[in-house]
Amino acid sequence: KKLSAQAIAILSIGSLCITSAGCNGKTKPAPIPPTEVNAALEMNPPIARSVEVQFKPDDPNGNLFVVADFGQGTIKGEFHAIMAGEEKVVLRDDGLGGDGTKGDGVFTAALSEDMDATAEHLRGISTGMKALISRPTFVGRERVARDTSLSRMVPFDRAAFVSGAKFPLIPAALCEPVTDVSIEHSLMVTNVGVVEDPTRTSQPCTRPDATGAWTFGKLMTDMANTASTGVSGEEFVKNWLKSWLAPTVVNGDPLPARTNLFNLVIRPWVIASGSAPGSFTIADWDTKPLDLGKAPFKLTAIVNRLDLRGNSGYTISNAGEGRFVFGTLNGTCAPTSFTVIFEYGVPIKKCRRLVDYARQWYDLRTHAIGSAAYNAALQAVTDVFAAANADPAKPNGSAINQIRTNEIALGSPWELREFNVDATTHQLFLTTVKQEPAKKYNAMAAPPVLPSDVTVMADWVNANATDIISDRHTVPLDIGGVPFLGGKSHTLSGGFWNAASGQILDPEARHHFSLNTCSGCHGRETRTDFLQVGTPPFGTAAVLAGFLIGITVNDPVSGTSRTFADLERRKDDLAKLMCRCKGRRLFDLAHVLTFKPIHMTH
C-alpha cells in the first residue's frame, strides 16, 4: 500500500534521528576514517600558513577547534593525521565535523580540552609575548629586525573567546618565553675547563695514554664497538687514516690522495706509539701499533644541535645531533688547520623524552662551567649519544651520523670530506658531502669549468627556487642519471656558488643554495675564514666564526645586507623545544603544524 504523506514525513524525521542525531535529539560527531601518520613527512612537512583556535561548547565533535590554513592543494586528501605530543590527532577538510568548506586547504581538528586551563595559558602567552614584539628573530638562518608574525598577536579577551571569537596561535607565542638559556653552558661548550678536563680529555704531549669519555681514541673505540663487530678501535682508526692516502672517486667526483697526512699525523703518532723512526714507510705503517691514547687530536668544542631535528608530528627518527669538534695537532702538539667533527644522532624516539633531554642541556646552567659538577652533568648528556651501543639500530650500534673534516693542512685548497660507517664492514668510508654539488658545476670554481655543467646547476636551482628559498631543498645524488652531489667540497678564499650572469633567475634562490653548501657557509656567504670553530693552542678557548656569534654580510652578488647570529637562533629553538609535550595538546598541535625543520648541515 502507498504511505500517506504524513507517514512519509514521520519516517523521514526518524531517519534523520538515526543517521545524524541520535534519539535524544543531540547531533552525533562526524566520523573520521582510519588515517595514519605519514612518517615520510618528518623533514618536509606541510606548514600551516596560519593556525587559529575557536571555542564551541555545544559542538558534539569537541569544544576547541583548531583551524589550520595550509593553502589549497598543499595536502592531498581530506584527512591529515599528525602527532600532538604522544597522541594522534586527525585534521579534516571535508566540510564536516566543524570544518568549514570542503577542499579549501583549511583543515580543522576538534579537541576536547579543559576550557579554564586553556584560557589561562592563552592569557599567559598573550601577556608574555608583549616583551618579544620588538626583539630580533630569525627567518631561516638570517636574523631580522623583529618577528612580523607577532604583530598578529592580540591581547587575550576571555569573554570574546568564550563567545566564539577565534584566537591566533602564533608559532613564536605558544608558551611563556624562556629567556635564560646559556649559550656557553648549553649550546656551544668551548670553556677550557671542559675541553681540557684532565680526566675526560687528552693532551698527547703531557698526558699520554688518556682514554677519558671525550677523547678521540675513546670515541673512536666506542664507534668501532669491538664487542659487537669484532673490529678493534685501532683497526677502525687505521682504515680511516688509510682512506686519505690513495686517490678515489665518490659519486663520479675524483678525490686526490692527501698523502701529507702521513707526515703530519700518521708518522708522529706511530712513533709516539713505540715504533722507531725509519722502521716504517707510508706503504707499511699500518703494520705497526697505533696507540689511540696518544691520538694527536685536541677537543675544542662540544655542541648541542637539537635544532637539526625533524618535525615530531610525523615521527621522531631525527631528534637532532650532538657533536664533538677536534683539532688536529702536529708532532709538537701545536694546532693545525685541520678539524674533525664527530656528528652523532640523538637516539631518542619519544617527544616527552626529547623534551626532558633538552632540559638536561638547559639545566647545565645551574653549575659553574668547567667545574667537576658541570663536567659530570655534561658527560651524562653526551653519553646518551656517544657511548657504545647508544643506537643499536644503526651500524656498529653507534649513534654516529657522520664524521666531517675541514682542512688545508694536507694541501691547498681547503677541502671538506664526509665519512659514514658501513653496516657490513663496520668501517668508516668516504661518502658524498651533503647539499653541495661537485665543484665542476660552480662557475666560481677554479678553471676549467664547462658552461654546460654550470647550466645544469642553474636550471636545477631555477626549477626548485621555491623550496630553496624556504631552505626545504635537498641536493640530489644525480640529475637524469648523471652524478651531481659532490664527493668533496673545496672552499676557496672568497668563494661562493653562482652561475653565469642572469642564469639563476632569483638572487634569493642563489643565496640560499650557496649558503646551504659546505663551501658557501664556510666561505663568502657568511664571511667565514673556513672554520666555524677554530683550533686554539692548549689553555685557550676556540675562536668562533661570525656566523655563530654575529656578523652582517653583504651578498657577494646582489649586495643585499644579511645578519647571522646562529647561536642566538639555536638559543631560541632550545627554549621553544622545552615547552613541548607537557600534556597541552592544543599547543603541541599548533607547534607541529607550524614547525619547519632546517636542512642545512651546518
Annotated model-derived regions:
Residues I8-T19:
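Bacterial N-terminal signal peptides
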Residues C17-I47, H602:
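Bacterial Sec-dependent N-terminal signal peptides
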Residues V53-G62:
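Short, solvent-exposed loop/linker segments at the N-terminal edge
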Residues V66-Q72:
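Aromatic/hydrophobic beta-strand junction motif of beta-rich domains
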Residues E87-G98:
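Solvent-exposed serine/threonine-rich low-complexity stretches and specific carbohydrate-binding patches
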Residues G98-E113:
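Aromatic sugar-binding surface patches on proteins
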Residues F138-H490, E525, T552-P556, R562-E568, ...:
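Conserved small-residue
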Residues L515-E525:
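The canonical Cys-X-X-Cys-His
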